[in-house]
Amino acid sequence: MSRGVNWRSMNTARTGRERWQGVAWIAVSATGFGAMAIFAKIAYQEAVSLTSMLFLRFVIAGLLLAAWGVLLGMRWPRGPDLLWLVAMGALGYVGQSFCYFAALKYASAGLVGLLLYLYPAIVTVLSALLYRRRIGAARGWAVIAALAGTALTVGGDLHSQPLGIALGVTGALIYSIYILAGEKVLPRVGALPAATVVMLSAAAVYGGAVAAAGPALPGSVAGWSAVLAIAIFSTLLAILGFLKGLEKLGATDASTLSTLEPLVTIGLALLVLGETVTGLQLAGGALILAAVIYLARHGAQAVRD
């Protein structure tokens, strides 16, 4: 779920073989991000605490990203840009990830995955309120469709608790603020350096939380497998896959294809966790994804880390 990319920074589309390679990379990325909720549910079943899980996720992924950046000769952010990215990681991404993973304790994986995808609509509204950007009638209807879809999705859910729904919506709101906060700094520093600093900053915060509360590390092969899958497959590989796909497809197509994420979450939740999906949830999810696709293709800004 964390990419650190400004969608507007790349708009070049490719054709032929390179384009299909881009589609494959985005499919890998979406599968990784979409599967994260499933791995988190498994880790909870193995008595891994939320703070320990997120500390391991961020420290493993952050160190591997840093090593990859060193091999590529990555230029590290400095000065005010570095401080801004540290704040984005230590405050924004810590808050968003806490809400998302905490929501999974009280709500179905499929519902939490769909609620996160409210962020393009929220970003559109916040951009209009904070920066006086014109929404326009069509994008306004897309925002309304996303909200209506959310109402249907929540109303059709038979198992989630109100706290889980509230945490899911709060996570989407924090993520939207995080997006707007990074809108200007990310084009200057680049996606990979930004994602690395954000990850390591979040790791430092969760490391402090683990030290204060005491670790609750995985005590089984299943627990460690789930945590490592979150850090490597659902974070590191998902980020790299998105960057490769963005390079080959451009921002608009990459963002549109990334709407596979909640579909992956819902499908895996059904197959692996035995979660049920009602007709109202399917209808609501379809409305949310339709709104997201429209916003992605018509000027919605997004920064994914």
What are the roles of these predicted feature ranges?
Residues 65, 86, 126, 135-155, ...:
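Hydrophobic transmembrane alpha-helices of multi-pass small-molecule transport proteins
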Residues 26, 30, 56, 97, ...:
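Helix-helix packing/entry segments at the starts of transmembrane helices
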Residues 2, 21, 40, 45-95, ...:
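Transmembrane alpha-helices of multi-pass small-molecule transport proteins
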Residues 38-50, 102-105, 151-163, 210-227, ...:
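Membrane-interface helix termini and inter-helical loops of multi-pass transporters
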Residues 32-39, 66-110, 115-116, 152, ...:
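Specific transmembrane alpha-helical segments of multi-pass solute transporters/efflux pumps
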Residues 43, 53, 57, 103, ...:
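Hydrophobic/aromatic residues within transmembrane alpha-helices
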Residues 52-63, 91, 97-132, 170-171, ...:
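Specific alpha-helical transmembrane segments that line the substrate/conduction pathway
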